[in-house]
Amino acid sequence: MAHHEEHKKVELTKKKLVDVMKHVDICMMTTVAATGRLHSRPMSNNKDVEWDGDTWFFAYADSSQVQEIAANSNVNLGYSRPDKIIFVSLTGSGVIVHDLAKKKELWYKALDFWFPNGPEDPAVVLIRVAGQYAYYWSKEGEGDLDL
């Protein structure tokens, strides 16, 4: 029988959560499909280091994630830094945002690859995930935080 050590509890703070998220550009966004199955895909969180509880993503209005969030707002974001043995699961509520000023504010040059018509393209929308709960694992231990 394998020996199992209980992970020690660590205090997860918003500052620690921001520090992990700002070093991980790509997270796995999980939404609920019409079939009820969980549907995950990689998404860039734009390294939003001034995190206030909301995480922003760009997507096309006709994409699966936008359609799924419109039908069921439950979203999970999975962040991973295996090199540092740090993992975060962030649960929240997603909403689709059609705000040109916000798109321009969050836009950065690398997005031109995915969205060649720029932030003015009406087919490009924002997904805002309002964080509600986070769980953190690291080599020091694990902890959670209600947001």
Segments from the language model and where they lie:
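A short mixed-secondary-structure module that forms the rim of ligand-binding clefts
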Residues: 46-84
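A generic structural signal for short beta-strands and their flanking turns/coil linkers
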Residues: 25, 41, 51-53, 71-75, ...
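Short, flexible loop segments at the rims of nucleotide/cofactor-binding pockets, characterized by
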Residues: 5-8, 34-35, 54-56
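Charged, gly/pro-rich active-site loop segments
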Residues: 2-12, 90-147
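General beta-strand recognition
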Residues: 28, 54-56, 135
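Short, basic/aromatic recognition patches
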Residues: 7-24
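A glycine-rich, hydrophobic loop/mini-helix early in the fold
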Residues: 33-37, 44-47
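A short, Trp-centered hydrophobic/proline-enriched beta-strand micro-motif
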Residues: 19-35, 75-79
